[in-house]
Every structure is written in C-alpha cells, then in structure tokens.
Amino acid sequence: MRHYEIIFLVHPDQSEQVGGMVERYTKLIEEDGGKIHRLEDWGRRQLAYAINNVHKAHYVMLNVECTGKALAELEDNFRYNDAVIRNLVIRRDEAVTGQSEMLKAEENRSERRERRERPEHDGSADGDDSDSDSDNSDNADE
C-alpha cells in the first residue's frame, strides 16, 4: 500500500455534509485494509480565486495509506459528488502524522490574538498592584 495526502474542497452550502462525507471516505479506505494517519478539517476558507462563482469553500485534508483500488474509488466519489468542487491527491513517500503547516499557522494566529488581548487586562492589574505596594512602602517609612 502507498501513502497519499488528499485535500478536497466542499461547496460552502454543503458544509453540514462534511462530517458524513469524511466518515464515508474513511470507511471506504479502512474497509479495503487502509489506514487514516491524519485527518484535519480546516473549515471554511477564502479561495484564492472563484470556482464556479464560489469564493469560499470548506477544506478537508487526509493522510492515508491505501491500495490503488481504494484510491480510484475515492477519486470516483469526488468526481461524481457535486458538493466536492476541487480535490488534490499527492503520493507521499511515508506516512505523515504530524500537524500540517496550515493548522500550525492557524493556532499561531489564535495564540497571538489571545496574547494581544491579554496584556490590556493583565498589564493594568499588575500596574495597580505595583503602585499599591510602593504606596504602602512609602507609608511605612513615615
């Protein structure tokens, strides 16, 4: 069996169906003896260019180990499913199980956003405590 990285884009109006689609595709691969090494749902994202007058899509990425037969059946499912507007299958040399760069970048963005929001609240509270400590030490000297 070979390793593949599969990314497919689902029409934004069909986003509710993504869970069922992923379940159906993983079942198809596992029934043929394959394995799912990584599954990431990247959610709705802006497309770089419009596809059939659609500007957003729901992205899903799979890293799988499967037979050629299972991959061909999966590609047929993509081809005949109107909800899948694009798909990409890349053959990999080995299984990839770590987090994707896309997901890492998203987490970094959310962490930076949280850090930006925190100092406003934490900084003012720390500043008040240090002022009150210095006021107390001044009073102790008198």
Swiss-Prot record:
Listed Pfam families: Ribosomal_S6
GO terms classed as biological process: translation
Gene Ontology cellular-component terms listed: cytosolic small ribosomal subunit
InterPro entries linked to this entry: Ribosomal_bS6, Ribosomal_bS6_CS, Ribosomal_bS6_sf, Ribosomal_S6_plastid/chlpt, Transl_elong_EF1B/ribsomal_bS6
Ribosomal protein recorded as keyword: yes
Bias type Basic and acidic residues, positions: 103-124
Keywords: Ribonucleoprotein, Ribosomal protein, RNA-binding, rRNA-binding
Residue span of region Disordered: 96-142
Comp. bias (Acidic residues): 125-142
Coiled coil listed as a keyword: no
PROSITE patterns reported in the protein's UniProt record: RIBOSOMAL_S6
GO molecular function: small ribosomal subunit rRNA binding; structural constituent of ribosome
Source species, domain of life: Bacteria
PANTHER family listed in its UniProt record: MITOCHONDRIAL 28S RIBOSOMAL PROTEIN S6, SMALL RIBOSOMAL SUBUNIT PROTEIN BS6M
Family: Belongs to the bacterial ribosomal protein bS6 family.
HAMAP family cross-referenced by the UniProt entry: Ribosomal_bS6
Summary of the function given for this chain in its UniProt record: Binds together with bS18 to 16S ribosomal RNA.
Name recorded for this polypeptide: Small ribosomal subunit protein bS6
Encoding gene per record: rpsF
